[in-house]
Amino acid sequence: MKRIFTLIAACVAVFSCAKKNEVTLLPASDFETVVDGRNVSLYTLKAGDLAMQVTNFGGRVVTLWTPDKNGSYEDIVLGYNNIESYVNNPGERFLGAVVGPYANRIAGGTYTIGEETYNFPQNNNGQTLHGGLKGLDMIVWDVDSVTENAITLSVLCPDGHDGMPGPLRRPRR
């Protein structure tokens, strides 16, 4: 009986000291491309036990690695492993992205402010969803600054962008 207990204790000690899985970052080269004449890149940020990857295409979070209670790392963001899947996937185009310039739907792709009626491209069964065909999720954002643990992105949509009135400048940190 004493030998069985010793064997069990030894197994527990060995398995509890087993190497925890590590963060597996996506290669930046899988996100290097040009969209609408603008360079797209993948940025890796680290702070403490966290690691996050962000692309300036749509200002989207691509991965977020965090340890569980046992110290094993998991990516908790639903997304793709390469830029082509984000650019060419209209069915799931909003994964990890900033939506806008508005979220949700504009019924019939039209609304009125005062006497002015605005019409937008419809991209969701006769409605305009999350900014329309060329919402913030489909634009290459400017990278204003990047450090080891922070990134600041911004985008400027001119007056009339996809039918929207007025210019819109949107920062994201």
Regions found by a protein language model. Give the residues of each.
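Surface-exposed acidic/polar loop and edge beta-strand patches at domain peripheries
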Residues: R3, A18-R173
